[in-house]
Amino acid sequence: MKITRLTTYHAAPRWLFLKVETDEGITGWGEPVIEGRARSVEAAVHELAGYVVGKDPARINDLWQTLYRAGFYRGGAILMSAIAGIDQALWDIKGKALGVPVYELLGGLVRDRMKTYRWVGGDRPGAIIQQITDYRALGFDTFKFNGTEEMKLIDSARAVDAAVVKVAEIRGAFGNTIDFGIDFHGRVGAPMAKALLRELEPFKPLFVEEPVLAEQAEYYPRLAASTSIPLAAGERMFSRFEFKNVLCAGGIGMVQPDLSHAGGITECVKIAAMAEAYDVGFAPHCPLGPIALAACLHVDFVSHNAVLQEQSIGIHYNEGADLLDYVVNKDDFHCVDGSIAALPKPGLGVEIDEEMLKRANENPPDWRNPVWRHSDGSIAEW
């Protein structure tokens, strides 16, 4: 079998799909994208196509190493996302060719279902409480929400109090009947992160995500020493080499690589194993589409330290299309009591409606993340 062609499709709300074709008629799907930089990743995918067209798709490890090492300059968000999407598609092809789900190729199941959590939006406690109430009725008991809006490097007691009041109201509304993570989203600098963690500790969040930006990873062990709240990070780390440094330094209780940003299945299986060796949980970041979610689930199902899976089915920011709109076999992704069962179909287990994708690609989205500014006019982290 040889790879013959790579085709990309843009689709609302902010996704890029990749179809990899072979001379035997077996196709694989991947999702290589950086939110807000889809065209940059698309260009990288087609630039890398020359390394894979004409090659045997079954040699996934060799192709991955070629894509990563054949360029003198390597790594980074764009290239690793391009590699990720190609890698996902190669695993999809191999599973379909052999008639088994990808998790069987990775050694088989360590669990039968994977616990997922719901992201809930809004900055007012009442809006978040209502969303949690609605999702609890569907069987979910674990959630995540943003901890704060933009925050200055050194900010006021009012800013801290606003974040604390929101969390206090949510915990007060539900008691310990729910768990929640709080996402700082890299909006908080190290000085304020320490203050916020101290004030939030009485409300027992399940974790705090991106307490500081990945560029400030040296603060993770210092912040961890100041709190009992588990810290999570990794959505803006793109290879096992970045995770190596963080794991060796300590401080992180949960790693969150993105299967569409951090080199795909091949790389993230290694990251999960590295984390397990350090007694660190694995909870892939996934605010993206169905192929990214499927890739995450296959790694979750073979990783003993996988603790939670993010997913964006029905989430408020999926404007123009929802996660399962491009999927034929929607029932395979059905959540029961907040968990998704092992995907039964060969490969990644996603049947894509390509005709719908083609129509979506005729009117491609141009999503970009908001640009925030502080009151003095300086740029703020979103």
Curated annotation (Swiss-Prot):
Stored Pfam families: MR_MLE_C, MR_MLE_N
Site (Increases basicity of active site His): 258
Details of cofactor binding: Binds 1 Mg(2+) ion per subunit.
Pathway: Carbohydrate acid metabolism; D-galactonate degradation; D-glyceraldehyde 3-phosphate and pyruvate from D-galactonate: step 1/3
Family the entry assigns: Belongs to the mandelate racemase/muconate lactonizing enzyme family. GalD subfamily.
Chain's role: Catalyzes the dehydration of D-galactonate to 2-keto-3-deoxy-D-galactonate.
Name of the protein this chain belongs to: D-galactonate dehydratase
Provenance organism: Xanthomonas axonopodis pv. citri (strain 306)
Gene: dgoD
